[in-house]
């Protein structure tokens, strides 16, 4: 499964306002172990997700379910993280996310839809581009979170995916931050053991990428390694 944002461009708009998220699309790859150039792919528009709500910021698979840490915007315009779950077989059979359920922190049960936003607040801030991993030996979940306007990158930790989550704990402050620092991801495949994890982030320049040439250190992943005791 590959979950993608569907973005609508408005290239005549103001800088940082020239695009918006309008949907989510699921790509099912039938032969994921083959060379990506030979992938057989099925594209499924899901009709779910926008700038204020998204369900696939971070993923965790526990057969047959996929757990999602998404984001939603509360009344104060702050993004909160929420937990959702869907059965992978039902997603394939229905070609939709109709089976998606949301974890209610108050009742400690999964609901078919979000009613009162505050009841589903897993932690804050929630992000559009974070990441989730589980360290089996240490028996702990780690989820990235960040404030894109401050340049601060942090992590949340929990023994259970439904919480309680502890943090945010600051792990890095981008020394080259100008406008935004974001897309804070964990890359488990780049770590040989659980003594450290490899992460990446992206930083934006103050120039308009539609018209101006920018330094190559911007809009390129930068990598960090964090040791874990």
Please tell me what each predicted stretch does.
Residues 5-50, 63-127, 133-177, 192-194, ...:
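Beta-rich carbohydrate-recognition and catalytic domains
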Residues 1:
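Blade-loop segments of beta-propeller domains
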Residues 184, 194-196:
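Extracellular glycan/ECM-engagement signal in secreted proteins
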Residues 55-59, 128-131, 180-188:
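Beta-propeller and closely related beta-sheet repeat lectin domains
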């Amino acid at each position: 499964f590959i979950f993608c944002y569907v973005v609508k461009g408005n290239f005549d708009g103001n800088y940082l306002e020239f695009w918006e998220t309008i949907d989510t699309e699921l790509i099912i790859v039938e032969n994921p172990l083959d060379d990506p150039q030979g992938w057989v792919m099925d594209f499924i528009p899901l009709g779910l997700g926008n700038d204020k709500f998204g369900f696939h910021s971070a993923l965790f698979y526990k057969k047959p379910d996929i757990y999602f840490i998404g984001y939603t915007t509360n009344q104060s315009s702050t993004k909160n993280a929420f937990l959702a779950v869907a059965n992978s077989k039902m997603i394939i059979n229905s070609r939709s996310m109709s089976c998606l359920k949301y974890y209610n922190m108050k009742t400690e049960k999964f609901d078919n839809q979000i009613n009162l936003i505050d009841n589903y607040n897993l932690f804050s801030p929630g992000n559009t581009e974070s990441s989730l991993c589980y360290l089996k030996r240490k028996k702990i979940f780690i989820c990235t979170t960040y404030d894109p306007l401050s340049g601060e990158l942090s992590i949340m930790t929990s023994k259970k995916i439904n919480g309680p989550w502890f943090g945010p704990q600051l792990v890095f402050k981008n020394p080259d931050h100008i406008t935004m620092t974001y897309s804070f991801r964990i890359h488990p495949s780049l770590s040989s053991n659980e003594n450290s994890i490899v992460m990446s982030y992206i930083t934006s320049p103050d120039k308009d990428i539609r018209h101006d040439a920018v330094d190559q250190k911007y809009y390129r992943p930068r990598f960090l390694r964090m040791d874990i005791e």
